[in-house]
């Protein structure tokens, strides 16, 4: 798998092995220090994922998280055990995911690959979101798209049923054919 990852150098004991594991997984990596020009580093690396190795309470980390969010890059934090409350950090920094130290570098590489896959699936379908529910919907779309069968998408008004149907159509073998949305609620029961 290819992908671009930016790693902070706040904790080199974690960052260097993680960098090696990501490169071994076929990802392009760049390491950035809090003393670097963060905006230039993000522009240069064009990351799909930013991995924070520490110092999340400091201003450079918050700035980098905001820059990553502006560029729609996923944000993965490696947290100290018993340290920061993940829920508050997710809200404050807009994190996509987190892992608690110590962890194996391969575990970080796996998490980064999942984030890249999720981001690419969101780009292909046009359905955006970082929640587990949205990720589950995206996985279901990808599973159902190759099936050569009629699919009924149910849900409350305004939940994006047509968007889901269009995403399935765009990923299917029938994508070259016209997409026709049908409001099944408007059809008489006897017709169905």
Role assignments for model-derived ranges:
Residues 123-192:
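AAA+ ATPase active-site-proximal loops
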Residues 1-123:
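N-terminal accessory segments that target, anchor, or regulate ATP-driven/P-loop NTPase machines
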């Amino acid at each position: 798998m290819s992908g671009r990852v930016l790693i902070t150098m706040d904790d080199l004991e974690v960052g260097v092995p993680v960098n090696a594991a990501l490169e071994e997984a076929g990802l392009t990596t760049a390491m950035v220090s809090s003393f670097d020009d963060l905006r230039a580093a993000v522009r240069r690396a064009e990351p799909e994922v930013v991995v924070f190795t520490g110092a999340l309470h400091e201003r450079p980390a918050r700035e980098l998280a905001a820059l990553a969010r502006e560029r729609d890059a996923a944000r993965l934090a490696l947290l100290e055990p018993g340290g920061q409350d993940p829920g508050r950090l997710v809200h404050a920094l807009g994190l996509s995911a987190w892992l608690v130290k110590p962890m194996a570098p391969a575990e970080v590489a796996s998490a980064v690959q999942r984030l890249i896959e999720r981001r690419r699936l969101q780009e292909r379908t046009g359905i955006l979101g970082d929640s587990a529910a949205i990720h589950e919907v995206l996985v279901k779309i990808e599973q159902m798209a190759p099936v050569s069968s009629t699919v009924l998408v149910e849900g409350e008004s305004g939940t994006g049923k047509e968007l889901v149907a269009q995403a399935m159509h765009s990923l299917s073998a029938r994508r070259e054919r016209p997409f026709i949305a049908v409001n099944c609620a408007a059809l008489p029961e006897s017709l169905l």
